[in-house]
Amino acid sequence: MRYSPEHKAETHARIVRKASVRLRERGAHGVGVADLMKEAGLTHGGFYAHFASREALVIEAFGDAMDRSTERWRKTLAELAPEKRLAAVVDSYLTPQHRDDPGHGCAVPALSAEIARESPKTRKAFAARLEAMVDAFADHIPDVPRKTARKRAAAMVATMMGTLVMARVAGSSEFSDEILAAGKDAALACASGPKELPKRAAKPATQKRVTSRTAAALRR
């Protein structure tokens, strides 16, 4: 039976969506093609009508998950007043609900350790999406050069994702909730940039001479 291009596109999207959820739940190597196709209501043999390889599916499924996260962030950032935008995204990201439901959450905390061991092609696709996430934040860090905004945004994203990983390791516990709360504060602090450190007082000349003599003695 021949299917229309529209039907094929819908089926393709359904497979990608199923794979996206299962990969985040079980990891890149925890999902078999046969089981995935069965869950999508299709036969194992139909897989290659949609994907050239398992790697192609993995890349597309990762991309789908990350694109959805970025789009949610951009929507939230665009809808709120400037002074509330970053806090709203951080608050919605670092929640017990997100911690406890990796299958429908951000792909980076769920899969980044595995992606680092995948092929260069897979890592490149993942990195491009990760950069888009950083840019989504950088667009809303005002009053600084773009390079500085990206640096702060990268620190924010890294803090948020690292916090979620730690919170999941700690499980549903008081300590895990404490990690989430601390991560929120730290992520928002990243947006403001580092506080200026006090300048170190110059060393007295006598101290420099003593230090030099001590160093010379140690070299003997």
Give the location of each predicted region.
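Polybasic, lysine-enriched low-complexity intrinsically disordered terminal tails
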Residues: R2, E39, K147, A191-R220
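Helix-turn-helix
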Residues: R14, K18, R22-A56, E60
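An amphipathic alpha-helix signature
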Residues: V16, A87, L130-A138, K184, ...
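Hydrophobic alpha-helical connector segments
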Residues: E60, R74-G105, A153-M156
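Short, basic, alpha-helical segments at the C-terminal edge of helix-turn-helix-like DNA-binding modules
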Residues: G63-S69
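Amphipathic alpha-helical segments used for helix-helix packing
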Residues: R85-A88, R99-A127
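Hydrophobic/aromatic-rich alpha-helical bundle segments in the mid-to-C-terminal region
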Residues: P120-A128, H140-K203
